[in-house]
Amino acid sequence: MIIGIDYGAKMAGTTVIACLHEQNQVTLHACAKNQDADQFILDFIKSYDDVWLAYIDAPLSLPIAYKRLNGNNDYFYRKADRITGAMSPMFLGGLTARAIQLKEKMQKAGVKLVETYPSKLAEVLLLKNEGYKKDKEFIPQLCSLLKEKSDFVFDENQVKTWHHFDALLSLYSAKRFEMQAAMVFGNPEEGTITV
């Protein structure tokens, strides 16, 4: 089973998991406010023992300058961030540290965690011109477009926030990887973003 995760602040209730089942059926699972988001993800994986791949909207590495390799002196952005327009892992600070720690825990559980960036996939799928991240009123229209492009089957009424929609985009990035249609940005030595 593959999942997509929109990763939020630890206790904010903004973390959402999109889970792909048989026949392209998708379910959405949202972390509650004041619930530990990291534990929510780990508990979810334990409850579904067949999860093998998870795509997450969070940095999973630091700029290569911190490894003192190749004489690179960009301490703020990785190549992948510059190419995709993603935020600096350093700006995201604690979220980045939590995501890297989560990656280690998930690897121990047999789950491969891959960094994705839903905004870049929205650009690739031409969803930005359709109101992506503009106003919540665009979510139903974008859900319909995503269903057409992905063949996902899900209840649009469950997509209540942009966090839910980004979880779906993260899941579609994982699906694109399965279909060998993914795009990879950045330097593998430093960390890549896959959509």
Which sequence ranges carry the predicted segments?
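Phosphate- and other anionic-substrate recognition elements at nucleic-acid/protein interfaces
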Residues: M1-V195
